């Protein structure tokens, strides 16, 4: 059994590493810490363009339909770079809508989560 990553996942890892190094350096993150939102919306839009927000969302709703292990590659590399972006929260929110939402809710919200137009977070009380 092979427990390593696939070639595609390794290419994704390289893409995330490059993004964190070139677009979201530690110096940039330090700057973002002083902003009210805590992150740069233009970088969020770039993440969306790269498809990271759509990884686990069904293609029917604008996603890529990949597995959670693919998302894990993104989360691992962004965490190494101290990413301030709510990528996991976004993925968990979309998974909740996908598993519990009505068809109308899925059609309304999942495309907006996939393209980064909307940011959601989960809270447990």
Regions found by a protein language model. Give the residues of each.
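Short, flexible segments with low predicted structural confidence
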Residues: 1, 18-19
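A non-catalytic, amphipathic alpha-helix used as a structural packing/dimerization or gating element
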Residues: 11-18
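Intrinsic disorder at enzyme termini
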Residues: 1-8
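Glycine-rich flavin
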Residues: 21-123
């Amino acid at each position: 059994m092979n427990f390593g990553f696939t070639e595609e996942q390794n290419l994704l890892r390289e893409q995330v590493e490059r993004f964190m190094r070139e677009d979201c350096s530690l110096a940039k993150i330090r700057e973002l810490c002083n902003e009210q939102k805590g992150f740069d919306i233009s970088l969020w839009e770039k993440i969306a363009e790269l498809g990271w927000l759509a990884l686990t969302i069904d293609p029917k709703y604008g996603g890529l339909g990949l597995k959670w292990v693919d998302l894990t590659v993104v989360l691992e590399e962004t965490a190494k770079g101290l990413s301030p972006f709510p990528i996991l929260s976004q993925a968990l929110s979309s998974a909740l809508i996908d598993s519990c939402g009505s068809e109308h809710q899925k059609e309304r919200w999942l495309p907006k989560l996939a393209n980064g137009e909307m940011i959601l977070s989960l809270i447990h009380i």
